Amino acid sequence: MTPIEPAHGLPKRVLIVEDSSLARLYYRNVLEGAGYHVDQAMNGLEGIEKALAEPFDLLIVDVNMPKMDGFSFLQLLRKSDSDAATLPALVITTEAESEDLQAARTAGANFYLVKPVSESDVRAYAAVLMGVRR
């Protein structure tokens, strides 16, 4: 699968905000294998710093993280005056309750997947969401 490229011809950039090193490695390998440039943050606070400092095309966000959870990360980012406030966000978590889905929507997620997720799902949702801005 070839990533959709912006007008300047560089690969699309994805920020993974996830505390699990294994999950970060999995998403990075899947997305880099599809031609995307990937950066990582270990929690919501680090994610905010990176999202506000560098241009990205997509956020992949876990919910349960130390220092700042994924919902708080998205809420804070969505309230910012930065271009990052409109980045599409894919929440991937182990939480499968309907109230978690509603909380993700309220926080500003564009889509919500429950772990475990397949490589094909990660690639497909990334490709679709990078064509969308909030």
What role is predicted for each listed range?
Residues 1-13, 20, 120-134:
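Non-catalytic signal-transmission and effector/linker regions of two-component phosphorelay proteins
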Residues 21-39:
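Two-component/phosphorelay signaling modules centered on CheY-like receiver
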Residues 54-60:
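Active-site beta3 strand of CheY-like receiver
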Residues 65:
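Receiver (REC) domain active-site loop signature in two-component systems and cognate sites
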Residues 110:
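Short, glycine/charged-rich "phosphate-handling" switch motifs in NTP-dependent
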Residues 115:
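A Lys-centered signature of the CheY-like receiver
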